Amino acid sequence: MKNIFFVGIIALTTLALVGCSTSTRQTDEKCHITGTANNNLNGKKIFLVPMDRPATMETVDSVVIENGTFEFTSDVNEIKVIRVDYHFRSGVQDLLVVSEPGDLEVVIDSISSAKGTPQNDSLQRWKELTERFNKVCVPFRITGKNAEKAGNVAVAEEMKSKLDSLRNNYRRQSHYLGESMKEGALHDFLLKQFPKTYKKKMPDGSIEEVPFFK
């Protein structure tokens, strides 16, 4: 009976400690990144680099990948890039993340991904949108270039028109994704990359504000 009671106490204590640890992580206002990577990268360095600040010893974090896993902790809420040592970067996709408070799970591979916090879930959606856009554009670009080389103006113009339409769609969706977020690092990033209007230099040298998408 005493043994059963003792085991019960240990179990309750363990649950309490796990609960306290989770609660602390949720309230420490830091971004906890847990990552997995291809086992071929074991023993290689992986870096967490700020996107909009100089990469220095103070701003860049690095760890060694062990057993296909790695971890980072950041207390600066900003857009960062996770990338492996450039000697081993071939075939491995860099990954944009937002180092906002919370627990973030990332996968670094030929197609990298992230999930776990609101901005990073939205960033993953934008990444997938971007990848679909790039993929669907490829055949139109190839056909357009071949048509230009062959002197087929009509087909070249048709492909250009299709690409313009796809690009306009992509820009509009990216802008409104950023706008829907109201605030935060990803909101700022998307609206900077995909504004409603931008200043364009005209043939006569004047500067006009024109739509970035329709």
Q: Model features per residue range: what roles?
A:
Residues 21-175:
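A non-transmembrane, solvent-exposed segment enriched in polar/low-complexity residues
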